[in-house]
Curated annotation (Swiss-Prot):
Subunit structure: Heterotetramer; composed of 2 small (MOCS2A) and 2 large (MOCS2B) subunits.
Gene this chain is encoded by: Mocs2-2
Protein name from the UniProt record: Molybdopterin synthase catalytic subunit 2
Pfam families, per the entry: MoaE (PF02391)
Catalysed reaction, written as an equation: 2 [molybdopterin-synthase sulfur-carrier protein]-C-terminal-Gly-aminoethanethioate + cyclic pyranopterin phosphate + H2O = molybdopterin + 2 [molybdopterin-synthase sulfur-carrier protein]-C-terminal Gly-Gly + 2 H(+)
Residues making up the signal peptide according to the UniProt record: none
Organism: Aedes aegypti (Yellowfever mosquito)
GO cellular component: molybdopterin synthase complex
Keyword Cytoplasm: yes
Principal subcellular localization: cytoplasm
Disulphide bridges, residue numbers: none
Family the UniProt entry places it in: Belongs to the MoaE family. MOCS2B subfamily.
Amino acid sequence: MNYLKLTFDKLEVGEINDLVAHESCGAISLFVGTTRDNFDGKTVVLLEYEAYEAMALKTMNQICEELRARWPDIKHIGIHHRLGTVPVKEASVVIAVSSPHRKSSLEAVHFAIDELKKSVPVWKKEQYAEGEGCSEWKENKECSWSKSHRDNHIL
């Protein structure tokens, strides 16, 4: 089963872990992406996320389909992404995958976060400490529609 969620609520690692747990699985691999307190020498106080929600959920589901095609022994997949304000140290994304053995779940989580960054329409704005330029919408250089990606890849 796939457990996909976009939410303005704080993400709970235990919740997604419980959702993907299964008695036939000996492995649950997790990725937790958090807000760090700095970027390019600026002090970050929080991130703000927006999404094209319907398309984001559709794309997240496509990522799950790709994971299942590559690692057929995967049992459950959870992808939760936070929207709105995310303070420093809090999770903005949690990905969890269960499988009978660790290799599949570890590889699948790694693939999932890379694909999420490349293809899911979620945007972030960094809020900086006072006197450091207030805030800035960030281009995700990994996403397929970004100028940086187009400049460095032949389409």
